[in-house]
Amino acid sequence: MAWFFAPEPVMVTADEALKGGRHTVLENPAPHTVLGTPVTGPWKEGQQRIWIGLGCFWGVEQMYWQMDGVEGTSVGYAGGFTPNPTYREVCSGRTGHTEIVEVVYDPSKISLEQLVARGLEAHDPTQGFRQGNDVGTQYRSAYYTENEEGAARVKAVVDAYGETLKQHGFGEITTEIGVISPSEYFLAEDYHQQYLDKNPDGYCPHHSTGIPCGVEA
């Protein structure tokens, strides 16, 4: 009997990536269907942003818009090379992007660490280029911030959780942590925005390890 296995996903290089360069995929997006807030701003004074990738972005966005202190969410793509990518292009693995949720929050009501911890608990950050049966570089675990100070705070939470996971027999965390500018986050098509509000019977499972992160709420 022969066994056939799909090759492991490989991250595309900048030279290999699709060139893109077209107009923005989603221009003039409608307000958030749940929160009623603008998807692209203007933001209130004091609001902050973080970009989070935990696999399929439909369920991740719903999880975050339900959190107290979160005042805006959208879904899109970041971490790659191709400007203004389409969903189909991202799914090809030839853009370098991962599926991302932009979270706009009030730091006086919820901390960056709490947002990071909630994400870590909602997926398996040791799976590399996959989450469950969703396989590809576009499903990799990632946190992107607007500055190095934010990235350092994210790394502290991720590193601590990595030690906890090791104590429970898990491998190394593969979460990508970086700094991006807002212009490096590309909105996904309208169809994907607040998908599980528009499609209540839609399916997008989380792949939690079941191990708590330990960050105080």
UniProtKB/Swiss-Prot annotation:
It catalyses: L-methionyl-[protein] + [thioredoxin]-disulfide + H2O = L-methionyl-(S)-S-oxide-[protein] + [thioredoxin]-dithiol; [thioredoxin]-disulfide + L-methionine + H2O = L-methionine (S)-S-oxide + [thioredoxin]-dithiol. Keywords: Oxidoreductase. It is an enzyme of class 1 (oxidoreductase). GO terms for biological process: cellular response to oxidative stress; protein modification process. GO terms for cellular component: cytoplasm. SUPFAM superfamilies: Peptide methionine sulfoxide reductase. InterPro entries: Met_Sox_Rdtase_MsrA_dom, Met_Sox_Rdtase_MsrA_sf, MsrA_MetSO_reductase. Gene3D superfamilies: Peptide methionine sulphoxide reductase MsrA. Coiled coil: none annotated. The active site is at C56. Its EC number is 1.8.4.11. Belongs to the MsrA Met sulfoxide reductase family. Has an important function as a repair enzyme for proteins that have been inactivated by oxidation. Catalyzes the reversible oxidation-reduction of methionine sulfoxide in proteins to methionine. One of its GO terms (molecular function) is L-methionine-(S)-S-oxide reductase activity. This is Peptide methionine sulfoxide reductase MsrA.
